[in-house]
From Swiss-Prot:
Gene induction: Isoform 2 is up-regulated during adipocyte differentiation. Isoform 2 is up-regulated upon refeeding after a fasting period in liver and in ob/ob mice (obese) (at protein level). Induced by chemical activators of the unfolded protein response (UPR) such as tunicamycin, DTT and thapsigargin. Up-regulated after partial hepatectomy during the acute phase response. Isoform 1 and isoform 2 are up-regulated by interleukin-4 in B cells in a STAT6-dependent manner. Isoform 1 and isoform 2 are up-regulated during lactation and by the lactogenic hormone prolactin.
Any one Gene Ontology molecular-function term assigned to this protein's record: RNA polymerase II transcription regulatory region sequence-specific DNA binding
SUPFAM superfamilies: Leucine zipper domain
Organism: Mus musculus
Annotated stretches, region: Basic motif: 65-87
Record comment regarding domains: Isoform 1 transmembrane signal-anchor domain is necessary for its own mRNA to be recruited to the endoplasmic reticulum (ER) which will undergo unconventional ERN1-dependent splicing in response to ER stress. Isoform 1 N-terminus and C-terminus regions are necessary for DNA-binding and weak transcriptional activity, respectively. Isoform 2 N-terminus and C-terminus regions are necessary for DNA-binding and strong transcriptional activity upon ER stress, respectively. Isoform 2 C-terminus region contains a nuclear exclusion signal (NES) at positions 182 through 204.
Annotated InterPro entries: bZIP (IPR004827), bZIP_sf (IPR046347), ER_Stress-Reg_TF (IPR052470)
Gene: Xbp1
UniProt modification remark: X-box-binding protein 1, cytoplasmic form and luminal form are produced by intramembrane proteolytic cleavage of ER membrane-anchored isoform 1 triggered by HM13/SPP in a DERL1-RNF139-dependent and VCP/p97-independent manner. X-box-binding protein 1, luminal form is ubiquitinated leading to proteasomal degradation.
Region (Leucine-zipper): 91-126
Residues annotated with Phosphoserine modification: 61
Protein name listed in UniProt: X-box-binding protein 1
Similarity comment: family membership: Belongs to the bZIP family.
Disruption phenotype: Mice embryos die at 12.5-13.5 dpc and display less blood vessels. Embryos display hypoplastic livers, cellular necrosis in the myocardium, hypoplasia of the heart and die in utero from severe anemia. Mice display severe abnormalities in the development and function of secretory cells, such as plasma B cells and pancreatic acinar cells. Haploinsufficient mice fed a high-fat diet gain more weight, display enhanced ER stress in adipose tissue, reduced insulin receptor signaling and develop peripheral insulin resistance and type 2 diabetes.
Keyword flag DNA-binding: yes
Amino acid sequence: MVVVAAAPSAATAAPKVLLLSGQPASGGRALPLMVPGPRAAGSEASGTPQARKRQRLTHLSPEEKALRRKLKNRVAAQTARDRKKARMSELEQQVVDLEEENHKLQLENQLLREKTHGLVVENQELRTRLGMDTLDPDEVPEVEAKGSGVRLVAGSAESAALRLCAPLQQVQAQLSPPQNIFPWTLTLLPLQILSLISFWAFWTSWTLSCFSNVLPQSLLVWRNSQRSTQKDLVPYQPPFLCQWGPHQPSWKPLMNSFVLTMYTPSL
């Protein structure tokens, strides 16, 4: 016997279940048969999918329903485990990528810190060469880390003006090199003067000490030599002159005078 359940209204075009109770199937079960309604057939013909309601399991025994429920629960649990495993592997990969990126950023941050320190030292050296006052540590840009972010503290307006005027200062330094050397000369000139004064004082003290030791000895030697020469000197005796007169053997004044002048007494 065939029982046909018609749709209660035209708006609901859901299929109905027909039970064939004339010939029982093997195992004493009734076979369900799904028959589409008029609108469902039209929708299938048009190609648009139609939402199906949940199938009633009135033809299954309680044991079969429990077995089916167990199978569905197993499938759902396995699906959930697979999804969880895939999600965990994805999160682990993201953690590894983030750790690598964090390590790279830390290295880059360290390099930037070293570069900033080198630039600050170079800036101070340039300011010292130009004769300008060095920047205070508070005016130097600093990198402050707060939490996971990094914030750059800008310097004062003086540092910005210095960066803008750097080319002009380089040109001035090239055009006037003595101005750059002037501070160094001011620092080196007193040192040179002090070194010269100390050398002159040392030289004078050394020469005085040398002459104080040598001069008395030379004076003694000179005095002794003078005394010895005075003792060895022979007193000068004027030549003996004969009186002219008739007692002379001959009267030859010129010849006798020449002989007397050439005569020297023997010692």
